[in-house]
From Swiss-Prot:
Binding, Mg(2+): A214, D218, D374
Residue positions binding ADP: G213, G237, F342
Catalytic reactions of this protein: (2R)-3-phosphoglycerate + ATP = (2R)-3-phospho-glyceroyl phosphate + ADP
HAMAP family named in the record: Phosphoglyc_kinase
Cellular component, GO annotation: cytosol; mitochondrion
Annotated organism of origin: Funneliformis mosseae
Presence of keyword Hydrolase: no
First-tier enzyme category under EC: transferase
Origin organism lineage: Eukaryota, Fungi, Fungi incertae sedis, Mucoromycota, Glomeromycotina
Keyword Metal-binding carried by entry: yes
PROSITE patterns: PGLYCERATE_KINASE
PANTHER family, per the entry: PHOSPHOGLYCERATE KINASE (PTHR11406:SF0)
Alphabetized Gene3D superfamilies for the sequence: Phosphoglycerate kinase, N-terminal domain
Name the record gives this protein: Phosphoglycerate kinase
Length: 416
């Protein structure tokens, strides 16, 4: 799966065509109030472009929450339609279903330039391919009904645009089942693919990956895929303790230790040696007597280790200095996973200092990519998203891409 050769919306002529766009409007709601509209704002450039290029109609489809294949009022996209209308400054027609004769007829006879938002795709089991039965167990959707669902979605457009990167790792009907001749990436997906291609297909070297997070076993595929591509690797966050204890027998007290992950540490280091990859680990720690915001704060280095009853929740200044030096040498930096428990202020300094270095690197012209999930939350928390080259919008999708997996939603797009 090449990331750099997919059709994008700019490659298409959408004039007088019905443009069917899979967006990600999975926004947090408090009742019917949207508490964060960022995902809607992110989709606006693609929607506006289709309208500027004189598309006949723009049909938007999305999921919201996990209604498990049935209609659940609190997951209706009706409040989202009002917000899209407000942001676009243009009327948005909300339809109470996403497939079926009524929807098909409405779209067929829509006014020129009309924007239509369909109801939640996941109200139908055919979107995800399964639903939950009364006993909470998965029930597979009927294959014929899935085919009909996909046919009905396909009938709503002349061209298909995917701008929902966060769902690209799911082989859902709206991601892979629309059978139109031209299927292209919207601006959001295009940017994701461009930046991940810069890292994974043709990085400017030296290439550094910063990998944090809790468990080695959760990140092992990621480490495995990247170790053959990078020049240096910083391993930080909770999973560093498994490396420190296994490799150097550092006393880690009650810090996180991943027994399963420990079995793979030797293998990782062997691969690093084989590919001539410099591996950087923390050397000092900010410690806590419990996993809590109000924990007592301590400090430990590799020499004395972390005492029993205490746990490392962040890295210390010496570690940050090592990270800084490694970041300074790199030209492409990919970061996935925080350096400490940034949710607690007393244990956020290591992550914040690493972020400051990453911002400085990006501002000096280096490519800095934040790989979604918690690290994207960190960038948002400190308001620096626009100071980095790219902050991915896909948690699971970016992780799978970095693990070397094909994303069904990307594979389904037409190639140039």
């Amino acid at each position: 799966m090449s990331l750099s050769n997919k059709l994008s919306i700019r490659d298409l002529n959408v004039k007088d065509k019905r443009v069917l766009i899979r967006v990600d409007f999975n926004v947090p709601l408090d009742g019917t109030t949207i508490t964060n509209n960022q995902r809607i704002v992110a989709a606006l450039p693609t929607i506006k472009y289709a309208l500027e290029q004189k598309a006949k109609t723009v049909v938007l489809m999305s999921h919201l929450g996990r209604p498990d294949g049935k209609k659940v009022d609190k997951y209706s996209l009706a409040p989202v339609a009002k917000e899209v209308e407000r942001l676009l400054g243009k009327k948005v027609t909300f339809l109470e279903d996403c497939v079926g004769e009524g929807v098909e007829n409405y779209v067929k006879n829509a006014c020129d330039g009309e924007v239509i938002l369909l109801e939640n795709l996941r109200f139908h089991a055919e979107e995800e391919g399964s639903s939950k039965g009364p006993d909470g167990k998965k029930v597979k959707a009927d294959l014929e009904k899935v085919k009909e669902f996909r046919r009905s979605l396909t009938a709503l457009g002349d061209v298909y645009i995917n701008d929902a990167f966060g769902t690209a790792h799911r082989a859902h009907s709206s991601m892979v089942g629309v059978e139109l001749p031209q299927k292209a990436a919207g601006f959001l997906v295009k940017k994701e693919l461009e930046y991940f291609a810069k890292a994974l297909e043709s990085p400017e070297r030296p290439f550094l990956a910063i990998l944090g997070g809790a468990k080695v076993s959760d990140k092992i595929q990621l480490i495995d895929n990247l170790i053959a591509k990078v020049d240096s690797l910083i391993i930080c966050g909770g999973m560093a303790f498994t490396f420190k204890k296994t490799l150097e027998n550092v006393k880690i007290g009650n810090s996180l230790f991943d027994a399963d992950g420990a079995k793979t540490v030797g293998e990782v280091m062997e691969k690093a040696k084989k590919h001539d990859v410099e591996v950087v680990l923390p050397v000092d720690y900010i410690t806590a007597d419990k996993f809590a915001k109000d924990a007592q704060v301590g400090y430990a280095t590799d020499q004395e280790g972390i005492p029993d009853g205490w746990m490392g929740l962040d890295c210390g200044e010496k570690s940050v200095e090592l990270y800084k030096q490694t970041i300074a040498k790199a030209k492409t930096i990919l970061w996935n996973g925080p350096a400490g428990v940034f949710e607690f202020d007393n244990f956020a300094k290591g992550t914040k200092a690493t972020l400051d270095c990453a911002v400085e690197a990006a501002q000096s012209g280096k490519i800095v990519i934040i790989g979604g999930g918690d690290t994207a939350t960190v960038a948002a928390k400190y308001g620096v998203e626009d100071k980095l080259s790219h902050v991915s919008t896909g948690g699971g999708a970016s992780l799978e891409l970095l693990e070397g997996k094909d994303l069904p939603g990307v594979s389904a797009l037409s190639s140039k």
